[in-house]
Amino acid sequence: MAQGPSQCPALLGAPASTTDGTQEARVPLDGAFWIPRPPAGSPKGCFACVSKPPALQAAAAPAPEPSASPPMAPTLFPMESKSSKTDSVRASGVPQACKHLAEKKTMTNPTTVIEVYPDTTEVNDYYLWSIFNFVYLNFCCLGFIALAYSLKVRDKKLLNDLNGAVEDAKTARLFNITSSALAASCIILIFIFLRYPLTDY
């Protein structure tokens, strides 16, 4: 029985099927490029930094045996931007640096600030002189005032206040000189009156 024209594939222009199992090569589309698939498996974190590079791992893997099945065509991806292409190339087997090491490199070193304080050790506080005047020559409590200023000088020296320590040291010296001079004058007058009493005149 003869077949009609609608049932004959040759009349419709359809290609005849092949029996050898081969497949026609796919023609790449316009505006597309080929990108190999990234290696399977999740990253191992910091241990991936010290592991073997991908090139050595690929060389150690056994070669695939030839099979009778036809080779599979590579996967076709659409056009991507430049940044996406760079990321794809990095994921295709190029070893990347550890992210923890990258974070350490980006961290800036903290700056060390050294504060230089003025030298207050050369400021004289007249502490011993003030104690002597307070104990022996405390004329009108001037020795006590001088001792108070001497203690203020010591406190300001601990606080590294050079200007305040110098001013209080000058005041303590002034009170010490005044107390010593007045007390010494009183002692001399007392000795004179004891040596030459007023009844002799």
Swiss-Prot record:
Task: Give lipid-anchored residues (S-palmitoyl cysteine).
Answer: C140, C141
Q: How is this protein named in the record?
A: Interferon-induced transmembrane protein 10
Q: Which residues lie on this side of the membrane: Cytoplasmic?
A: 149-173
Which InterPro entries does this chain map to?
A: CD225/Dispanin_fam (IPR007593), IFITM_antiviral_protein (IPR051517)
Bilayer topology annotation: Multi-pass membrane protein
Please give the residue ranges for the topological domain Extracellular.
1-127, 195-201
Q: Which UniProt keywords apply?
A: Cell membrane, Lipoprotein, Membrane, Palmitate, Transmembrane, Transmembrane helix
List the residue ranges forming a coiled coil, or say none: none
In this record, what's one Pfam family? CD225
Residue ranges of the TM segments:
128-148, 174-194
- What top-level branch of life does the organism fall under? Eukaryota
Region labeled Disordered — which residues? 1-23, 60-88
Recorded source organism is Mus musculus
Task: Indicate where this protein resides in the cell.
Answer: Cell membrane
Annotated Pro residues bias: 63-73
One cellular component term (GO) for this entry is:
plasma membrane
Q: Which family does it belong to?
A: Belongs to the CD225/Dispanin family.
